[in-house]
C-alpha cells in the first residue's frame, strides 16, 4: 500500500513516520502532486501556527492538491484544524475550507492553555476510525484552538466545554490529538485508518 505524509513544511514528521512504520508500512514524505494523488492513504500533519501552515500550503502549491484528494486523508492536530474554514489565530486565517466550521481559541475556564496532556475522547458509535477503541480512551493533546462540536464531529473531548476531538467529511478525517503520541489507543486509531 502506498502511504504518503504530505510535506507541509510545518511539522515534525519523524514521529508520525515512525508510528506508521510500526504497522509495517514505509511512508513516503512528499509534496509532489503525482506521488500525493496516487497515495492510498494520505497524512496531513501540522504543528505551530495556522498562519505559518497556510503560508507553507500556498507556497508549496498544496492548497488545490489537498482539496483534489479522493483517497482517505488524516489531518493530525493543526492538520485537522486546516480542514476548517477559518482560524481565529493571528487576527483570522483562511483555511482549506473542506469542513464548513471555524476554529476559535478555546475559552479560558480557569484551566491552563494550551490544553496539554492526556484527556478522554468519546467517539460516535460505529465510526471506523475508532473501531475497537474504548469509549473514553485517553489521547494526547497540545493545542489552544479547537473546532466546536459540529455536524462533522465523530468524537468529542471536554476541556471546560466540549470540543471536536475528531472530524470526518467524506474522505477527509481529522484528529485534534496526536495519535502518534497516544500509546495503544493512538496506535489502534492509526491502524484503523491505514486499513480502511
Swiss-Prot record:
Domain Glutamine amidotransferase type-1: 2-196
Catalytic residues identified in the record: 77, 178, 180
UniProt pathway: Amino-acid biosynthesis; L-histidine biosynthesis; L-histidine from 5-phospho-alpha-D-ribose 1-diphosphate: step 5/9
Main localization category: cytoplasm
Keyword annotations of the record: Amino-acid biosynthesis, Cytoplasm, Glutamine amidotransferase, Histidine biosynthesis, Hydrolase, Lyase
UniProt xrefs under SUPFAM superfamilies: Class I glutamine amidotransferase-like
UniProt subcellular location: Cytoplasm
Protein name (database record): Imidazole glycerol phosphate synthase subunit HisH
Quaternary structure, from the entry: Heterodimer of HisH and HisF.
PROSITE patterns the UniProt entry points to: GATASE_TYPE_1
Amino acid at each position: 500500500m502506498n502511504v504518503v505524509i504530505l510535506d507541509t513544511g510545518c511539522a515534525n514528521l519523524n514521529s508520525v513516520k515512525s508510528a506508521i512504520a510500526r504497522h509495517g508500512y514505509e511512508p513516503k514524505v512528499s509534496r509532489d502532486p503525482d506521488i500525493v494523488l496516487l497515495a492510498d492513504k494520505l497524512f496531513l500533519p501540522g504543528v505551530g501556527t495556522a498562519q505559518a501552515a497556510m503560508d507553507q500550503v500556498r507556497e508549496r502549491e498544496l492548497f488545490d492538491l489537498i482539496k483534489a484528494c479522493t483517497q482517505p486523508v488524516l489531518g493530525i492536530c493543526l492538520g485537522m484544524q486546516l480542514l476548517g474554514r477559518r482560524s481565529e489565530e493571528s487576527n483570522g486565517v483562511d483555511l482549506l475550507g473542506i469542513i464548513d466550521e471555524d476554529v476559535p481559541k478555546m475559552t479560558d475556564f480557569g484551566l491552563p492553555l494550551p490544553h496539554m496532556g492526556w484527556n478522554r475522547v468519546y467517539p460516535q458509535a460505529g465510526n471506523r476510525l475508532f473501531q475497537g477503541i474504548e469509549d473514553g480512551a485517553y489521547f494526547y493533546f497540545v493545542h489552544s484552538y479547537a473546532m466546536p462540536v459540529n455536524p462533522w464531529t465523530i468524537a468529542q473531548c471536554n476541556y471546560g466545554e466540549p470540543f471536536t476531538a475528531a472530524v470526518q467529511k467524506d474522505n477527509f478525517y481529522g484528529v485534534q490529538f496526536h495519535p502518534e503520541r497516544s500509546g495503544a489507543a493512538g496506535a489502534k486509531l492509526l491502524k484503523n485508518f491505514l486499513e480502511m
